[in-house]
Design a protein with these regions (language model features):
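Conserved catalytic core of the tyrosine transesterase superfamily
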Residues: 1-298
Length: 298
């Protein structure tokens, strides 16, 4: 796929030799990162890209170099998506920032509330959507983990689930009472109606009674995002970012968040502390009396 992209840059885009060589260098470096982490190119997720950017940052690369790598990845994955090599573009929300702040997008509390209030819970699909969004925000699951959930992965009585992340690593993740309530409603009503006469071990189903696809859920979430004007920054992974950010903003331990997210390397989790630090500074300058006075006098 990389070779085909390079040929496209040469034959159709007519880029200079030096520019093409930069693309080759960046993509070779990226492919080596994927290979060392046992990640298939076709299965790269938003989190993998965020992890790669964090890796570049922690390896001491300059902001200019990292921004070039991001630009390369955005163009590469846009090409793969347009060629229908991948069902979803994981680099869609990966932006080249004006200032060097490689921070994942997340929702505010108000945006989360608006999103959670959108599904029509009088319908089977609305009950499903409500349960999926509540569970995603409550657990920080990857979208692949969410759609792969089976009925026997849930312990409703104790309010936790078992998921199998990257490398088939098992982890136990608790979920909220709200998520529990909407899960029970969906399981006892909406899921039965979606299932009809079929049998399925999977928790979340489409209108044909089959396991909902990653792309299908992506489209559902984007449609909700359009209704409240946050489509540009909303994806399944945005809710994972939001889960981590909100936990840290409310004092959660970084190591605990790492375990809940299923990160093998804590440096991937540490990127969320930058967001929380920005939030702390905002609170300080807004509410500390001497900080406000100094700011007013400047």
């Amino acid at each position: 796929m990389i070779e085909r992209f390079i040929n496209y840059l040469i034959s159709e885009k007519g880029l200079s030799k030096n520019t093409v060589e930069s693309y080759v260098f960046d993509l070779t470096h990226f492919k080596n990162f994927l290979d060392s982490n046992n990640i298939e190119l076709k299965k790269v997720s938003e989190e993998d890209l965020t992890g790669y950017v964090a890796y570049l940052y922690n390896s001491g690369y300059s902001p200019r170099t990292i921004m070039r790598h991001i630009s390369t990845l955005r163009n590469f994955f846009k090409f793969l998506y347009n060629e229908e090599d991948i069902p979803v573009n994981p680099a869609e929300i990966l932006e080249t920032p004006k200032a060097f702040k490689m921070l994942p997008k997340y929702l505010t509390n108000d945006e989360v509330e608006k999103l959670l209030n959108l599904p029509d819970t009088t319908t089977p699909t609305g009950q499903r959507d409500k349960a999926m969004i509540e569970l995603l925000y409550a657990t920080g699951l990857r979208v692949s983990e969410l759609i792969d959930l089976k009925m026997n992965n849930l312990n409703l009585e104790e309010r936790f689930l078992i998921t199998f992340g990257k490398g088939s690593k098992e982890r136990l993740v608790p979920f909220s009472k709200k998520a529990y309530q909407y899960l029970v409603t969906y399981i006892n009503d909406g899921r039965i109606k979606l299932l009809k006469d079929k049998k399925s071990y999977f928790l979340f189903l489409n209108v044909r009674g089959n396991k909902i696809s990653r792309q299908g859920f992506w489209k559902i979430l984007k449609a909700y995002g359009r209704k409240i004007g946050i489509e540009h920054k909303l994806s399944p992974h945005t809710l994972r970012h939001t889960f981590a950010t909100h936990l840290l903003e409310h004092g959660a331990d970084l190591r605990a968040v790492q375990i809940m997210l299923g990160h093998s390397d804590i440096s991937t989790t540490q990127i969320y502390t930058h967001i929380s630090n920005e939030r702390l500074k905002q609170i300080y300058f807004n509410f500390h009396p001497r900080a406000k006075k100094q700011d007013d006098n400047d």
